[in-house]
Design a protein with these regions (language model features):
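Helicase P-loop NTPase motor core
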Residues: 89-92, 97-187, 212-213, 245-250, ...
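Conserved helicase NTPase motor core
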Residues: 1-83, 98-102
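Short glycine-/polar-rich loops that comprise or flank the Walker A/P-loop
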Residues: 56-59, 65-67, 88-92, 129-133, ...
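Helical mechanochemical/support elements of P-loop NTPase systems and associated helical scaffolds
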Residues: 5, 13, 59, 77-80, ...
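A short beta-strand-to-loop transition that corresponds to the Sensor-1 phosphate-sensing loop
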Residues: 64-67, 74-76, 98-100, 110-111, ...
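Conserved helicase C-terminal RecA-like lobe
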Residues: 175, 179-181, 185, 200-374
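P-loop NTPase Walker
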Residues: 25, 108-111, 340
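A short glycine-rich beta-strand->turn/loop micro-motif centered on a GG-aromatic cluster
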Residues: 189-201
């Protein structure tokens, strides 16, 4: 279909460097030092390409964490990271064992999970004043969703920003019950990877109206002008009482209003409308304060002060089709990535039965590795 993906680009580049010495020499002459981040996630093709770029030199720096190798299904292998000192005997190895993100209890849990695994470090937290982990056992999936939603609502009521809360899960379908429970509690949320903000019809219309006003030469301070346009499209002074499409529409219009409020002094309506169109094209989505729902894979590289990890039962995490030792180890690393997304508070939960209440479940082996202390239903 005359289309190529990222892997095709890598293969094409590798083939060109192998076939065209002139191009290879130019690349090696152009770049003197190579720095590779997330080195535990490189694939064989990427490793071969890196070796072609570097050549016989040793001017290379790699950064990685073998405990965060969670893309083996895409060809990633931590072996390149672990074997690096053997391939470069003169390499200076710096172990980054101080964790500046997570509290002491979270780091201790992470160490328990990865103890004895290849390349695992024994981390030390720089934050000694940390809240203990909270573990909860729910009767069924619906009860687990209600627990998470209720606890999130309590945290928000106590002053925690919704943007500082994330709920992480092994697979996306686990969010369905949770979304309903959050709506029942009146808690705004965003599903990471869901439909883009600027794809919403009411947002497209609002951007079009703002652009039209700018082209027509409407004068005045930016925020009042934008507010007038948004009020004309249904933005009220008060949020709708109930969750649903009307509330979602209101929050999207508020997000546009917030963009106008955050604009630098002196920004014109035309400049603002141009910025909106640029963000629409690039998919840079604003949002009002909302709890993030995400799979652990999608959450990698991010962090939140408060993290809930749900579905921590055998067959869910580790997932049911993880049968081999290597597959279980990948699930273990994924669990490690999940718990280390939390900075201050970490909530771990599972349900004893499924939604229909028919299939009993056992707690995840990863949860059991952390010891006792779960709250009972």
């Amino acid at each position: 279909h005359n289309r190529i993906d990222f892997e095709d680009v890598l293969l094409g580049m590798l083939g060109m460097l192998e076939a065209e010495k002139r191009v290879l020499d130019q690349v090696r002459a152009q770049y003197s030092v190579f720095v590779v981040d997330e080195y535990q996630d490189v694939s064989p093709v990427q490793q071969k390409l890196l070796e072609m770029w570097v050549g016989p030199r040793e001017d290379i720096v790699v950064v990685g964490d073998a405990s965060q190798t969670i893309y083996t299904f895409a060809g990633a292998s931590s072996s390149y990271l672990l074997d690096f000192p053997n391939r470069y005997p003169g390499a200076h190895v710096i172990k980054l064992e101080t964790n500046y993100r997570s509290g002491e209890h979270i780091v201790t849990a992470a160490n328990h999970v990865m103890a004895g695994r290849p390349g695992a470090l024994t981390l030390v937290s720089s934050n000694r004043d940390a809240t203990p982990l909270r573990r909860h056992v729910a009767l069924d999936d619906a009860a687990e969703a209600r627990y998470v939603a209720g606890t999130a609502a309590e945290l928000i009521a106590s002053g925690v920003s919704p943007d500082d809360i994330a709920v992480l899960m092994r697979f996306g379908a686990q969010s369905l019950l949770l979304e309903n429970a959050l709506r029942d509690q009146g808690v705004s949320h965003r599903v990471q990877g869901a439909a883009a903000f600027f794809d919403e019809p009411h947002v497209k219309r609002a951007v079009m109206e703002i652009r039209g006003a700018a082209v027509a030469g409407v004068q005045g301070e930016l925020l009042p002008v934008v507010q007038d346009i948004l009020f004309g499209l249904g933005l009220g002074a008060e949020a709708p009482e109930h969750q649903g499409a009307e509330r979602a529409r209101y929050e999207d219009l508020v997000a546009l209003q917030e963009l106008a409020a955050q604009a630098a002094p002196g920004v014109t309506l035309l400049e603002f409308s141009t910025m909106l169109q640029r963000r629409m094209e690039t998919g840079d989505n604003p949002s009002v304060g909302a709890v993030t729902l995400s799979t652990v894979h999608a959450a990698k590289g991010q962090e939140w002060p408060v993290v809930f990890m749900i579905g921590l039962a055998e067959g869910q995490f580790p997932i049911s089709y993880a049968k081999t030792e290597d597959a279980i180890d990948e699930e273990r690393r994924l669990f490690y990535v999940g718990i280390t997304r939390a900075r201050e508070r970490l909530f771990l939960s599972y349900a004893q039965k499924n939604r229909e209440g028919q299939q009993p479940r056992e707690p995840s082996r990863f949860l059991r590795a952390l010891g006792e202390g779960a709250e009972k239903p």
